[in-house]
Structures are given as C-alpha cells and as structure tokens.
Amino acid sequence: MTAAVLVLTGVALVLAVVAWVPKSGATLEIVLSGVMLACLTATGILLLAGHGVQGWREAWWNILLMVSGGLAVAGGGPLTTSVLALVDRGNTRSQSTQQAGEVLRGGALIGALERGAIYGSIVAGWPEGIAIVLAIKGLARYPELRSPDQPASVTPTAVAERFIIGTFTSVLWAVTCAGLLLSR
C-alpha cells in the first residue's frame, strides 16, 4: 500500500507541475487537473482505508466521510445555480439579477472552496469555522457589493440578493452534507 500511495502522490505532483505549462484554461490543463484530483482522491482512499484503521466499519466510515465531502463541494454548485435560476424566474428584475453574476466573478470557485472549508470545519468538530469562512467571504466581496462602478443594468440590490441567496444555499448544502453524515 505504501508503494501505491507514493506512486499516486508522485503522479499527482508531476501533473501539478506540468499543469502550469499550458495557458490558463487550456484543455490539457483541465485534463491534467482532473487526473491530478483523481490521484489525490485515490491516495486519500488508500490512506483512509489502509493500515491503522480498526476494522472494515472504520474503513468504510472514512471512505463515506471523504465521498460526502466531495458531494458537499461538487453538489452545491448545481444546487446553488438552480436556486438562483428559480429566484430569477419569479423576479421582475430577472435581467438585473442574472447580470449581477458578472459583477460577482469567480462565484463558482469561491463557493466550492467555501463549501469545502465549512464541511471540513463541521466534520472536524469546529463549527466556529463557519463564522470565519463567512467573515472572510463577506469582507472579500464587500467592495464588489458596494461598488458604484457596476454596469447600469445591474442594481446594487440585485448583486446583494445574489450574494446572500447563493451564500446561504451553498452553506446550507455543506452543513446538510456534514450534518447527515454525523447524525449516525
């Protein structure tokens, strides 16, 4: 098992270095990043299910912990997008709210990082981490929420609505994934 962990970690490291070579967003970079993530996941599963684990129940629990974390991070994006689409559908200012997404660039990536940090802090037994994650996000986004340089078709209210609804949906998803797992 040690050899498998070392090989997977080495492959992930090589791919990480090679991924810096292509231009940002290139197909090769995306493929390398995906394979690198798969190597990291396989390494984590091997480590969590391997030596030092007391019995099959603990091994499966560790794997479930990791899979649930992946669901918290990856599943929250489509859910948040769907909730925002539902909000926009019933909104008379739909165009303004949709264009607010252009003001809040990087929201999908920030949301994934946010969900990962929240899931990790809850599973680690440190729920105070939620407050820290939300404070960092709020402070980082504050200039965009209050900027007078927004396009004329986007109101500050629409940007704030999108930020609040997206954040709450994202956080509730991560908390739900962690809470259901820990409710056993």
Feature roles, as predicted:
Residues 1-130, 135-184:
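Multi-pass alpha-helical transmembrane bundle typical of ion/small-solute transporters
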